[in-house]
Amino acid sequence: MALASGPALRALAGSGRLGLGGYGTPKRGAYEWGVRSTRKPEPRPLDRVYEIPGLEPITYEGKKHFVPWLARPIFPPWERGWNDPRFHRAAPIHEQTLYKEEPCYIFHQRCRLLEGMKQALWLTKTKLIEGLPKKVLSLVDDPANHIENQEQRVLDIISHARLWHSTEDIPKRETYCPLIVDSLIQLCKSQILKHPSLARRTSAQNCTLATTWNRESLLLQVRGTSSTILSAKDPLPVIASREEVEATRSHVLETFYPISPTIDLQECHVYEVKDDTGFQEGYPYPHPHTLYFLEKANLRPQRFLPEQLRAKMLLFAFANALAQARLLYGNTAKVLEQPIVVQSVGTDGRVFQFLVLQLNTTDLASSEGVKNLVWTDSDQLLYRHFWCRPVIKKKVVVEPVGPVDFQPETFRKFLALYLHGVV
């Protein structure tokens, strides 16, 4: 038997004091061996200063150092004497200049309406019509409006966004979704030689918008930025005739009692009642034409459902139309002699939502009278799936790289909405 060295003998002899039979295993608590708690330690309790009437607590303020048996002094808040933006402290809500007793329910870009389109229709006093207007569908079916080699060019746009543009094996949605929409808009702009009136339009991004209106006893506001807006020098032509507008008086708006119509809207007491189209006075392209909404979140829980996306499209299109109507006709609530038409397109890079809104009235307080009109064409697939890598089984290419089930009809509707007002 080999003799152990001095340090080894001392380690074996001293292991008995560690517990567990002297085998050198350290003795620890049960929770230290298992999964430890993730709860943060309790904060240190604040020193209580007993305020006894007629007696002044004895503190260590004059000592200039901590004394454990004396009370902690209470110092007044320190003022720098100048405003440091790194340590800005906002005033209490009730002391701010824009504070109001009446709450305002605000809809912004990240609001997801629980009831979706049904809730948006009630908030905007709008009647829903399934399908696109006949005037737009006539542009879809007219071969004269098609682009030369149209289908192949759209396929190239899809492949460029999802395969050629990025160095990643499988590009993310936030990469290919804006690229597909921008490329499709650029393809539509190529018709400017055939339709010179397209030169009277321009697109802008991140335009601020704010519109406020009363709906029954509620004060509502749409506020935020739009991703891309196509504006023009001339407004879109009216879609529904005067007889169709008057026929909306008999339409009854669907309610969703007992759910509150303001559910999922942000309740706020600090707000400003204003109408802002996002453009300064004298802007040469003042009339909104089409709004483009991109649902480019990579994670599924962060994406809008199609119903919620259509509701957001309706509310922002309505807000743009209402702000434009008040700019042209004033703030008086009335039925518009010349209704305002605004279009909207929403997509996640694969599924498209189309919407056309006609604002007929700015009298939104009551549910009676003339209603606004909206036409929707929902869940239009541009393609069903895109293979970034070929599917090979038994050394045979089963699915080649590229889109699956391409639907050219979807781009025709996209192009028809772009050409609406010119053709």
Curated annotation (Swiss-Prot):
InterPro entries in the record: mtLSU_mL37, Ribosomal_mL37/mL65
A Pfam short name: PDCD9
Coiled coil: none
Superkingdom of the organism of origin: Eukaryota
Main location: mitochondrion
Feature: transit peptide: 1-29
Assigned keywords, A-Z: Mitochondrion, Ribonucleoprotein, Ribosomal protein, Transit peptide
GO cellular component: mitochondrial inner membrane; mitochondrial large ribosomal subunit; mitochondrial ribosome; mitochondrion
Subcellular location: Mitochondrion
GO biological process, one term: mitochondrial translation
GO MF assignments: structural constituent of ribosome
Cystine residue pairs: none
Quaternary structure, from the entry: Component of the mitochondrial ribosome large subunit (39S) which comprises a 16S rRNA and about 50 distinct proteins.
Protein family: Belongs to the mitochondrion-specific ribosomal protein mL37 family.
UniProt name for this protein: Large ribosomal subunit protein mL37
Organism: Mus musculus (Mouse)
Gene label: Mrpl37
